Structure formats: structure tokens, C-alpha cells
Amino acid sequence: MSDDIGKILENWDYRLGRVDARRVTGDDGSEKLQMRIDLGLLQMNAQFRPDGKRPFGHPTLLDHFLLRLEKHRNKHGGEDDEFSINPDECAKLQQEAIQFHHRSICNFELNDLEAVERDTDHILELLDFVQDYAAQEEIGSSFQQFRPQTIMMQTRAVGTQFISDENYGEAMEEIRAAID
């Protein structure tokens, strides 16, 4: 079997300015999401981490660090003083956030609004964690550039669901809360 994806790309045109996403079943039987990009496509798992990895045996890298924080607190009387994540760990968390962001874009295009909400919740929790525990404050601050986009995606997903349910007042409340 060839590793060339040319046939797939020939049958799925890239359209500038559009998000083209689809669901496929992987060779392993699991659901995958694909996003067409100009030079190819991105493929990600529909569940858990988009890249399918289990860092340190956990569903996500954030889960690993949250457990590390919990162990630190248990050892230090509930305090999180002296707990930090180094720049390399922050970079790996940033990579995880970007993967979840790509998947949330695909899921929004596919109208899987619950999945968008789940993934944006994960990203926002990750941003909070890095802001609170990055060893270098400027790294924690730099992560915050992703917050407005993530809040916007989450608000669009939740608001769209409210509108679909003809609950316009709740949709407006969601938008106002996001702005605040």
C-alpha cells in the first residue's frame, strides 16, 4: 500500500477561505476527523487527544499535569507553592491546545456543538493552568493570546445550540457573558 495521499486530495478540492471538514472511519475502526488544507489534510481522532497519544498513560497532557499538581498539594499540605511547569512543558501543552483547537474548528463545521464545547473547555482549563503555573510569567501571559478565539468558538457553539432550540434569550445571555 502506498503512503501517497494524492488520490484523496484529487477527490477533495481545497477551497480558499473555507473550512472543509469530514468524518471518516480509520483503519482501526475509530472515528477520525479530517480538515482539508492547501497542501494536504489534517487528520485527528474524534475522541480524547486529537493525535491519539496518551502522555504518561493519561488521556491528555493536561490530565498528567493536573495529577502532578494534586500529588504536589497532597505532599505539601494542600499548598501549590513551589509547583511550576518549565518552558518545555509549556510548549508541549501549547501543542496540545493547538490540536484541540483544530478539532474544535472541524467539529463546528460538522455541527457537533457538544464536541466544540468539550474541546474549548479543555483549552480554557489548559490556558488557566499554564497562566497559574508557568515557571516564567511571560510564557503564561503569552498563552492568553488564544483565550479570545477559544471563548468565541465556545460561545458560537453554545449560542448556535440555543438558537437551534429557539431559545434566543439564552443565546443572548451566552454572548453577553462571553463579552464580559
Regions found by a protein language model. Give the residues of each.
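Acidic, Ser/Thr-rich low-complexity linear motifs
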Residues: 81-87, 132-149
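Conserved small-residue packing positions in alpha-helical repeats and bundles
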Residues: 104-107, 111, 152, 157-160
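Internal amphipathic alpha-helices that form coiled-coils
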Residues: 159-163, 167
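N-terminal alpha-helical interaction modules that lie
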Residues: 1-130, 166-180
